[in-house]
Amino acid sequence: MSSQGHHKMSGGGKKGAMEQDYTDVVDLGDRFSADMARLCMNEQYADVEFIVEEERIPAHRVILAARSEYFRALLYGGMAETTQRQIPLEVPLEAFKVLLRYIYSGTLLLSTLDEDSTIDVLGMANQYGFQDLEMAISNYLRQYLALDNVCMILDAARLYNLEELTEVCLMFMDRNAGDLLLHNSFNTLSKESLEEVLRRDCFFAPEVQIFLAVWKWSRFNSNVDFKSVVSYVRLPLMNLEHLLQVVRPSGILDPDKILDAIDERSTSKALPYRAALWPEENVAAETFLSRCIQGECRDALLDGDVTTYDMENGYTRHCITDSKDAGIVVELGTFCMINHIRMLLWDRDSRAYSYYVEVSGDQQHWDRVVDYSDYHCRSWQYLYFEARPVRFIRLVGTQNTVNRVFHVVGLEAMHTAKVPRLVNHFVAPKTNVATVEMSAIVTDGVSRTRNALINGDYVRYDWDSGYTCHQLGSGEIVVRLGQPYYLGSMRLLLWDCDDRTYSFYIEISTNRKEWQMVVDRRNDRTRSWQNFHFTPRPVVYIRIVGTRNTANEIFHCVHLECPTQDKNYLKKIADMEKEREKREKEKKTAKTDDDNIASTSGSSLASGHAESPSTSSSSSQSVLRSIHWPPQTREVAVAPLTPPALSPPGTPALPAPLTPATSSPHNNHEQNQPSNISADASHHTSPSSRSNPSPSLSRSRSQSAELEPVPPLVELDTRETL
């Protein structure tokens, strides 16, 4: 046991040894605090006196200086107070005594203080630099917010720059806006705090009620210029009756302001709505009085059931047409501030949908917040956009790869603080989105389990299971993500239970028609883990095509993730990006200097200082060709390749060569003319019609014969048939 632990001490005696516990750590902190507390406001040993509200309070310089940087500078910093015995302070007396007790004892019982004293102590803690006490009081006040104290606490929080306490107060006022406007404490708000409250979109109450409260506040604060305050009242949100019968008779607004408000209300396409804010809560629910007002089978959309649905029940739908009125429309119970929508598309097969989402405040003017009309999507959709007041949500399907109907099983709408990085409205994820949980699916390839490539298990694999494969020259592996993501990296685990190597390339697409090659390893011999980095772009489909296996004619992949989750590789990417930005900045600086020289000399030097092409100039066909780090900063344009066609259903079982292939993968690729394959064009291939294209094909016949029978493979060339 360590020297700071407990020990046992034994001693001899007629009745045997006796054991006694002891410790080498002496902790008498409570007694020390009590002794120090007795010195508080005690004449004994006192060497300074504070004059507060004409009362003399003795204190000890060294204790105050040790506890506060403010007092150290005041009492030992060479100022006039350094040599003075008596120092006057302009602070509340009772609150100062409370603070002194805290300085000497380190404890403070806040429950014994009234609200005014608590605020006074908070102010002195801020003034004298007691940050721990300031934070403790701030946290205490957060727990006891009420209508009769929130205005006072907000003023104090803003005065002392307590941002967290300020935000909590504002959110409390948002939640209780209607009651707060009628409470007498509202009239005690400072002008600056009132303006901060009124400018918030989520301070949600009828605008006429807000106007009346501001008008009343102006009468209680007649010495304040309230013109800037009343300017935060959103007059266009009031109807004509309120403007003419409430606002105009008050006489506090110019008649032209009222006319402008009437005109804006009738002509504006984007009124400055206020909305209720319920963080992290689904407001598209029956508990918030929300309802589906357009679409077929409307009751299913907001019932909260996202598990018990099939081909006949459990979804809301609309026919996909060119009509502007087509779609599924949800009316929220009231105006709500939202920035996130979760939507479950019908996913009992591998079909894909395209759609867009619009929001509105009046069903007349719609703002499109998400547009995936040109992208294939499936299952759960995670949509993010700039927070805004919303009353109506419209979902419009533009494509179904099986028929002309758009099916939605469930919808959630909320305001969340967990917003990922967005690039051109696409989510740029940090975590792996090529997973079953994120609605990804393997549409092409051969495996014992459908989604072995994206199930997250890259440890349990062997000769017979745990991988997805295709035959060289006549197949491919295709993964479809749940929705378009803005991606710039991937990581792939090639089957590596022996020392074989592979060659391959990777293409990406958003619609399975137009492909871009982003990784080219056809001339490399690779094995095990492979990291890739390419120019970021929207991605839905990922196509992996093997071109060589040094052991047999089958290409095997164990695991795919995008973006890569390799922390070391991500750090290298970040470092390389910083270096690239630094070089671009230096180029711009050099070009600016050259332009200045050219303009001064009167000669054109633009051609002599032209920039070299950047790596992003050919981003549409950029290909990463190096297997080693760092990736080449100069990408080489390569004509995109289309994979060979799959063998039609009913073809003979895959060959099982027992020796490594001798033919060139490039020759095989040329002999099999490439062709595009639609995922929705044909029927399923029977699992029993294929033999097992296992890595074990390279072993001897005797070894293969001794193997136990294995489950049949699943052919993942998925075709929708509904």
Curated annotation (Swiss-Prot):
The keyword Membrane is annotated on this UniProt entry: no
Domain BTB: 46-112
Compositionally skewed regions (Basic and acidic residues) per UniProt: 577-594
Biased composition (Pro residues): 641-658
Tissue expression as described in the entry: Detected in the brain (at protein level).
Keyword terms: Coiled coil, Cytoplasm
Feature: compositional bias, Low complexity: 607-626, 686-704
Biological process annotations from GO: adult locomotory behavior; circadian behavior; modulation of chemical synaptic transmission; positive regulation of circadian sleep/wake cycle, sleep; regulation of synaptic transmission, dopaminergic
InterPro entries: BACK (IPR011705), BTB/POZ_dom (IPR000210), BTB_POZ_domain_cont_9 (IPR052407), BTBD9_BACK-like_dom (IPR034091), FA58C (IPR000421), Galactose-bd-like_sf (IPR008979), SKP1/BTB/POZ_sf (IPR011333)
Region of interest (Disordered), residue spans: 577-626, 640-722
Coiled-coil regions listed: 565-593
GO CC terms in record: cytoplasm
Every BACK domain range: 151-247
Mutant lacking the gene: phenotype: Adults display increased motor activity during locomotion, fragmented sleep and a decreased lifespan. Walking speed is not effected however flies spend more time moving with slightly fewer pauses resulting in longer uninterrupted bouts of walking. The total duration of sleep is not effected but average sleep bout length is decreased, the number of sleep bouts is increased and the amount of wake after sleep onset (WASO) is also increased. Dopamine levels are decreased by 50%. No effect on flight or climbing (negative geotaxis).
Keyword Cytoplasm: yes
Cellular localisation: Cytoplasm
Main location group: cytoplasm
Signal peptide extent: none
Pfam family, one: F5_F8_type_C
PROSITE patterns the UniProt entry points to: BTB (PS50097)
Function recorded in the entry: Essential for the homeostatic regulation of sleep and motor activity, by depressing hyperactivity and wakefulness. May function, at least in part, by ensuring dopamine biosynthesis.
Name under which the protein is recorded: BTB/POZ domain-containing protein 9
Lineage: Eukaryota, Metazoa, Ecdysozoa, Arthropoda, Hexapoda
